[in-house]
Amino acid sequence: MAKTIQAIRGMNDCLPTQSPLWQKVEGVVKNVISAYGYSEVRMPIVEMTHLFSRAIGEVTDVVEKEMYTFEDRNGDSLTLRPEGTAGCVRSGIENGLLYNQEQRLWYMGPMFRHERPQKGRYRQFHQCGVEVFGLDGPDVDAELIMMTARLWRELGIAQHVRLELNSIGSLEARANYRTALIDYLEQYQNVLDEDCKRRMYTNPLRVLDSKNPDVQAILGDAPQLSDYLDAESKQHFAGLCELLDAAGIEYTVNQRLVRGLDYYNRTVFEWITESLGSQGTVCGGGRYDGLVEQLGGKPTPAVGFAMGLERLVLMMETLGNTDVRRSVDVYMVTAGEGTMMAGMKLAEQLREQVPGLRVMTHFGGGNFKKQFKRADKVGAAIALVLGEDEVAAQTVVVKDLAGGEQNTVAQAEVAKLLAHLA
């Protein structure tokens, strides 16, 4: 017997028992974003490798350790996308969407990072991202945060997430802070772990979000980024906080929040949950006003966020918030000569007359008992029964599978009877 082939580690199937909750989450996400007037964009899964090294940063963990990179037959270095913002910016520049234009875009799809698989963190994962180009005020930052807050309410998880905010200022402000932070950290090299020592001179702001308790202890007296912010960044952040206060959105200012990608400036934010253990960030984003120019476009302000769908689904499962619509509403049961085609025709008629009604037809024969058992297994609410007598009389038996009651009705009337299920 041939050896069975397994899925790649960290890349998971979404099985029929799991997909309804995924569809619910995806549907809510799309509906909320669409309510704000944003438009969908779809980008390739594979991009040129240098897009990510230029956008994300050469010395970030993503570029150094986590990307799936390969050389194609033409000798070009290609990478499975580890995130969506860089590709969205590339698409906007290439297709002339960004120059002197305002764009509000969203996308959804798989991303890839070669990380150690664990609960809430996988090598293939799915993100929804929202990006706004051409607007530089704190008002659009606030709208994106308000959008995410609405999404949590729609998903029923608003009481289990909290918002953390920070401003990391301009490139110049961060450069000044970077120098001060390195000077401070050099005094504690005996405390820093190898990861932090490596980051200290290449990307010292990442030391701030180290999970090492010894490192966190010495950061208590480290220079504060807020002391190095430029006046415009301070004003922008104050405006954002004022708008969030007016909207009634609670938040905490976390001065160690820097995000893991190099392109951010000014506003950064994360939504955190305690429901997922160590993988507590369900959504993160911020401003990246320099990225469009960095990738070859004209200077264009931009802000956005991304959320991990696996973590949202996992969070809803953890909280028991798993009510989803059944995948089958009506199960068509037939028995007797000539009844199969009549059943298929009636099922098709119902699909046309009641948009959204989910009708499954039984195939493979078997007596009524076997067919009703199958109807129960797929979770149908109603069984429609067609025998030879019903076909001749143009009627159908409508059976409630939960209560057991059944009635015979004219086939012409059954659509009205089932409309409430759609």
Swiss-Prot record:
Just give the chief location class.
cytoplasm
Which GO molecular function annotation, any one, does this entry have? Answer: ATP binding
Would the keyword Oxidoreductase be found if you checked this record's keyword annotation? no
Show the catalytic activity. Answer: tRNA(His) + L-histidine + ATP = L-histidyl-tRNA(His) + AMP + diphosphate + H(+)
* Alphabetically ordered keywords of this record: Aminoacyl-tRNA synthetase, ATP-binding, Cytoplasm, Ligase, Nucleotide-binding, Protein biosynthesis
Q: Which InterPro entries match?
A: aa-tRNA-synth_II, aa-tRNA-synth_II/BPL/LPL, Anticodon-bd, Anticodon-bd_dom_sf, His-tRNA-ligase, HisRS-like_core, HisRS/HisZ, HisRS_anticodon
Tell me the Pfam families matching this sequence.
Answer: HGTP_anticodon, tRNA-synt_His
Compartments, as annotated in UniProt: Cytoplasm
Q: Which SUPFAM superfamilies match?
A: Class II aaRS ABD-related, Class II aaRS and biotin synthetases
- According to the UniProt entry, what is the EC number of this protein? 6.1.1.21
Q: Specify the superkingdom.
A: Bacteria
For this record, an example GO cellular component is: cytoplasm
Its Gene Ontology biological processes? histidyl-tRNA aminoacylation
Q: How does it assemble?
A: Homodimer.
Name the HAMAP family on file: His_tRNA_synth (MF_00127)
Q: NCBIfam families from the xrefs?
A: hisS
The record's family statement is: Belongs to the class-II aminoacyl-tRNA synthetase family.
| Official protein name in the record | Histidine--tRNA ligase
Organism, as annotated: Vibrio cholerae serotype O1 (strain ATCC 39315 / El Tor Inaba N16961)
